[in-house]
Amino acid sequence: MRVTIMSLARALQGVRVLDLSRLLPGPFLTMILADLGADVVKVEEPRRGDYMRDFPPRGNGPSGRYLTVNRNKRSVTMDLKDDRERERFLRMAERADVVVESFRPDVMDRLGVGYEALNGRNERIILCSISGYGQDGPYRDRAGHDINYLALAGVLGMSGQDADGPPALAGVQIADLGGGAMWAAIAILAALLDRDRTGLGTHLDISMTEGALAMLASEFGIVDAEPSTPTRGTGLLNGGAARYGVYETSDGKYLSVGALEPQFLGRLAAAVGLELRPGPGGDADLRRQLTGVIATKTRDEWARVLAEHDCCCEPVLELDELPDHALHRERGVFFEIPD
C-alpha cells in the first residue's frame, strides 16, 4: 500500500506532547508530530505568547506564519514563573509523553521544569531541547539565528555560485528546519521506540548547528579524497559545472538545469539544438552556449519543450505559482486550514 505522510495521521495517536517552543524550529517540529496524530498542547506565556503571532503580514488575528506551523494543536497560556502555574504544568507533564522546548540552556532548570523535575514526576517523559549550539560546550549561551548556525556549520561557506563573491543566503531557514526540526522529529520517534523497550524516557539535545553540519557528509568525503578543500562556486553541485545551474529565460524568469549524467546532457543538447564537442573552452564554452540558447525562449516555453526530453530541466517557480502547478495540485500538497 502506498502512503504519504498525510496518510499517517493516526500514527502517533495517543502520544501527548507539551510544546513550550516559539518561532520556527520547535513549532515546525510539533506541527509534524501533530500531523502524524499526536495530541499537541502549545503552552504560551500569558503576555506576548509566541512572537510569531505578531509577524507580518497579519489580519485581525495571529499571523499566517503562526497559524501554518501551529495547525492541529491546542493552545493554553501559562506563566511558569508562577508557583501554581508551574505546578499545573508539572501535573500535565505527568500524563505527557514528550515536552519540546527551545529556550537557552538552563532556562528550563531555572523555571523549575527541567529534565530532573520532569523525570521526577514521570520517568517515561521525553524532553527534546532544540538550541543553536547545544546544551553544553563553549557556545551554549550564545544568541544566534539560522544564518549564524549555517555559518559555523560550513553550509553558508559552501553556498553561492560565485567563488569570488560572498556566500549566498537560501530562501528558507535550512538550519532551523533541516538541522533542527527534522533531526528533532527523528530523535523523538527513535526515543519513543526506545522507551517501548526500556520503559524510560530521555533528554534529547538537538543542536541546529550540528544538524546542519551533518548535511556536509559527502563534502567531507571529498575533503578526504582531494588535495584541496572544496569551495563555493567550484564544485559540481554549487556552480562549478555548466550542466548544473540556473539560466535566465527571455521573460526574465529562470530555468533549472540538472543534466549531470551524459545521457541527460545529450538529451538537453539535442532539445535545444547544441552540438556538444570537446573544445579548448571546456565548461566555460558550454555555459556560454546554454546561456545564449536558453535566453531565446520564455521559461514556460522551455518547460513545455524540455518536458518531452527527460533531461532534468524544470522551471524555477515563485511562491504564488506553487498551488496551481500540476505536480502539487495532483499530489494534494496544498489544502485550506479551517478557521
Tell where the protein language model's regions lie, with residue ranges:
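N-terminal helix-loop segment corresponding to the beta1-alpha1 unit
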Residues: M1-A187, A191-R197, T231, I337
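Residue-level detector of beta-strand structural context in well-folded domains
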Residues: R65-L67, L204, G245, F335
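Aromatic-enriched alpha-helical interface/lid elements that frame and gate functional surfaces
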Residues: N238-C313, D320-E321, A326
